[in-house]
Amino acid sequence: TNQMRIATNSSKIDISKENKTASLAKIFSTFLSKGDIVFLHGEIGAGKTTFVRYLINYLQLRSKKSLSEVTSPTFNIMNEYQIKNLIINHFDLFRIEKTKDLQNTGLFNDYKSKLTLVEWPEKIISKPKSRYELFFTFNKNTNKRFIKIKKIIFDLEIKENLGENKYVQIKGDASFRTFLRKSKGKKSSIIVYCKKEKKKNLLNYDAINKNLIKNKIIAPKLYYQNYKNNFIEIEDLGKKTIFEIFSKKNNDNNLK
């Protein structure tokens, strides 16, 4: 199977074609929320700002906002974007030379209420422990560009064109879990990912589902689990919520 994994420590993805950069940025954007910090490493021309542009534009599209012209804040140091209640701070630290200059940027001020994207993070001495790290490389001889993702999201398998499966974030429960609908043609499944919860919480979620099925109560079947990286893939029972289903049943009964 000609597949690659997008988010393990050994991931190396060919993004030489811009549509691959766009597809990967779209998928990656579904995992980001307030408080997340993303470091983008790589030389000039490696594709960092292009990736950020698609990332921000996809977040804007998802919120039905007009698209911004996203450029590298080389001289401004930081550009800010607001998408509804999400503030995105895009930093470029290339021109920063002294620690004092870095402190004046307000880099991690109130970061928990924002999404922080940082190009040239090598200038930062005291780095936050929780962060995503993207490493961009560019081979001038072959004109090839690659990206590695260091912080594990999950080892989601994707075809090399990065466009065969579609991923759409859907409403979940009141927990920190993230739910994605993975689809290809008429086939679909649900990815349940726990970014902020412990392994125990995901095991409990799985155990409850198994118990429901055992007692002949409709619940999604488990297709694949990776408890080490905090995600499972389960059956997609449809797009309607339980409230919509019961509402339809009540209406049908009233008609009778």
Give the residues covered by each predicted segment.
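Post-Walker A helix-loop "phosphate-sensing" segment adjacent to the P-loop in P-loop NTPases
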Residues: 57-69, 83
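ATP-binding pocket architecture of kinase catalytic cores
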Residues: 183-256
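Short phosphate-coordinating micro-motif centered on Lys-Gly-acidic
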Residues: 4-5, 11, 100-102, 108-159
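Conserved lysine of the Walker
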Residues: 48
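Hydrophobic anchor at the beta1->P-loop junction of P-loop NTPases
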Residues: 38-40
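P-loop (Walker A) phosphate-binding loop of NTP-binding proteins
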Residues: 43
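ATP-binding glycine-rich phosphate-binding loop
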Residues: 162-183
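N-terminal pre-Walker A segment at the start of P-loop NTPase domains
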Residues: 4-27
